[in-house]
C-alpha cells in the first residue's frame, strides 16, 4: 500500500467530493494541492494532520475511518497544511510515567491505561514532565480527551515545550492502539 503501510486522502469538499490529494508518506506541505480540506478518508494506519505546514498548528489524530466533514475530526476550520503517519510500537504495549514537576521531579505516577482526568485519577492539576516507556500517547489540554492534542513517541520529555506545549496544562491522555 505505501511506505507507511497506510494511506490518507484529503478532499476539498464535504462528503469526499471535489479535488482529492492522496498521501502515503509524511508530507510537510500539501497546500499547493488543495486550498481547503472538508473531508478525509484514512484507508490505513493512524495519521496526525496539522493545521499548518511543517507539522505545526493544531494537530488532530485520525485512526482508520471516514471523516465526511471537518467537524468529525474536531477541526476548527477547513484549513490543513501537513500530515504524518503515526508509528505505533509493535506488540501493543503502552506505559507512561507522568511527573508533577519538571525534569522528572516531584510525585511520579505510572500507568498503562488511558486517563480521562489527571485530577480524578492522580490528584494532579498539571503534568510538567513525563517518560514514555512504551507505545505512543496523546496528551490533551482538557479532561475527557478534548482540546489541543500533543503526540508523544517513546522518549523522555523534561518540560512541556519538549512535547510542543507552551504550558503544562494537560488534563487527560490516552494510548494510541491499532
UniProtKB/Swiss-Prot annotation:
Residue ranges constituting the Beta/gamma crystallin 'Greek key' domain according to the UniProt record: 6-44, 45-87, 94-134, 135-177
Transmembrane segments: none
Sample GO molecular function, one term: structural constituent of eye lens
PROSITE patterns: CRYSTALLIN_BETA_GAMMA (PS50915)
Pfam families, sorted: Crystall (PF00030)
InterPro entries to which the protein is assigned, alphabetical: Beta/Gamma-Crystallin, Beta/gamma_crystallin, G_crystallin-like
Gene3D superfamilies on file: Crystallins (2.60.20.10)
GO biological process, one term: morphogenesis of an epithelium
Alphabetical UniProt keywords: Acetylation, Eye lens protein, Repeat
Family according to the record: Belongs to the beta/gamma-crystallin family.
Role according to the record: Crystallins are the dominant structural components of the vertebrate eye lens.
Domain text: Has a two-domain beta-structure, folded into four very similar Greek key motifs.
Oligomeric and partner information: Monomer.
Protein name as catalogued: Gamma-crystallin S
Organism field: Mus musculus (Mouse)
Organism lineage: Eukaryota, Metazoa, Chordata, Craniata, Vertebrata
Amino acid at each position: 500500500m505505501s511506505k507507511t503501510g497506510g494511506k490518507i486522502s484529503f478532499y476539498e469538499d464535504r462528503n469526499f467530493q471535489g479535488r482529492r490529494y492522496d498521501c502515503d508518506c509524511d508530507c510537510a506541505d500539501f497546500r499547493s494541492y488543495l486550498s481547503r480540506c472538508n473531508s478525509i478518508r484514512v484507508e490505513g494506519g493512524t495519521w496526525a494532520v496539522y493545521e499548518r505546514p511543517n507539522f505545526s498548528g493544531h494537530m488532530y489524530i485520525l485512526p482508520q475511518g471516514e471523516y465526511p466533514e471537518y467537524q468529525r475530526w474536531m477541526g476548527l476550520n477547513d484549513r490543513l497544511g501537513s500530515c504524518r503517519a503515526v508509528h505505533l510500537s509493535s506488540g501493543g504495549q503502552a506505559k507512561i510515567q507522568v511527573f508533577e514537576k519538571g525534569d522528572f521531579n516531584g510525585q511520579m505516577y505510572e500507568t498503562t491505561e488511558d486517563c480521562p482526568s489527571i485530577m480524578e485519577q492522580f490528584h494532579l492539576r498539571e503534568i510538567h514532565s513525563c517518560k514514555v516507556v512504551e507505545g505512543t500517547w496523546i496528551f490533551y489540554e482538557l479532561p475527557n480527551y478534548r482540546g489541543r492534542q500533543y503526540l508523544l513517541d517513546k522518549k523522555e520529555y523534561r518540560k512541556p515545550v519538549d512535547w510542543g506545549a507552551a504550558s503544562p496544562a494537560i488534563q487527560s491522555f490516552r494510548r494510541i492502539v491499532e
